[in-house]
Amino acid sequence: MGKTAGEIYSEMEEYEDNLAIETLNRIYLDKVINPYRKSKKIIDMHTHTNYSDGDLSPQELIRLAIDKRIGTLAITDHDTIEGIKKVNRNEDIIVDSGIEIINGIELSAKTDKGRMHILGYGIDLNNKALNKKMIDLRDNSINSVLSIMEQIKRDYGIRFSYEDIKELVNANHNLGRPDLAKLCVKYGYATTYQDAFDKYLIDAHNKTRQTSKGLQYQECLELITNSGGIPVLAHPKSLELSEKEFLIILKEMISCGLKGIEVYHSSHSKEEMDYYLEIANQYGLLISGGSDFHGKSVQPDIELGTGKDKNIKIKKLSLLDKLHK
């Protein structure tokens, strides 16, 4: 079996000799990039890096996308654009492969139950209002995590050191429950991230979420639209609404500027995808889809590009057609 893009590129990084680097670059081009350019490619419009709650750096994510024969990749970190900014500055990009990278974000909206996330595609990363809001959301993420830490200390006697807290507050990414799950595993309070969520973090989050200073969905839609982006409702299944309730909120969101819906997602069954596709067509919404890939330690059963148990394989989306116009 041939080496992956990541393995070859890691070898290149170990060399300081220019000739060795040039040789490895040729190997990388021949063994990875050229076959990638000739291959039939798929689309993944929902991914996360370590700038939010993913495992991989933007560079590592793009390498993996090349290995997975992904032709279009949207980086949609939670409530931050720092990861995609790094890609756009070419500070964290590998040898040009022709892969298409879409500017994206996933904003969290306040909701009484379930989870409401709104994806934004094609956003202007230099938009002043967007960047100001990112600072506010960064501060909110710190306060939210500190509230959850206090809750699990009260409920379960779990305490983390001052150094752990200091490291979290000074991290270069928005904080979230996976950061706490990592600490729970580190100190033996849980065996896996999911174990930490099941034992402590879901309950603590539910107890503290009402004090959250999250955005209303109207503000999410406005923020994305005003930054030149296209707002899309992410994984609608996570709203945990009845069909009647879902259609009521969907119509309200459309009236406030919602333009698309994530039909294809790792958590959706075939029947659910068919239903959301019908809804998209009925209400004139753009169709999107993606794996919602976070990485192996966060979601070990979800693969980049193909989702859970290969339940998605996207080759065409009306959302992408709109972005290309």
Locate the predicted segments by residue.
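Active-site gating loops and adjacent loop-to-helix segments of metal-dependent hydrolytic enzymes
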Residues: 110-136, 140, 186-206, 303-324
